Amino acid sequence: MNIALLGFGVVGSGVYEWCRSREDLHVRRVLIRSDKPEIASIATRDFEEILHDNAIDVVAEVMGGLHPAYEYVTAALKAGKHVVTANKALIAAYYQELTALARQ
């Protein structure tokens, strides 16, 4: 399964390491704000690269906060991607909208 991570802070880097330990998961892209030499070959600052990459099965939002997480998650769902998040603020604010998008 090909995964894109949105964020590479404490949570994102931990999810990245966990995915690397699994043979069935492949982190294809990581959306970053600042340079991360350890993931330079898969890092991007352009969310559109993730959105339009048909090989990406799942987008994992690990950035936290409401914005731009909301915009990224809704765009990914509208593009037909599966989305995983543990962002409590995002879910609390937009639960009904996000679940409706996910069901489409």
Indicate where each model-derived feature is located:
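Rossmann-fold NAD(P) dinucleotide-binding segment
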Residues: 45-86
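NAD(P)-binding Rossmann-fold cofactor-contacting core
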Residues: 21-39
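Short beta-strand "acidic-cap" motif of Rossmann-like dinucleotide-binding folds
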Residues: 5, 27-30, 85
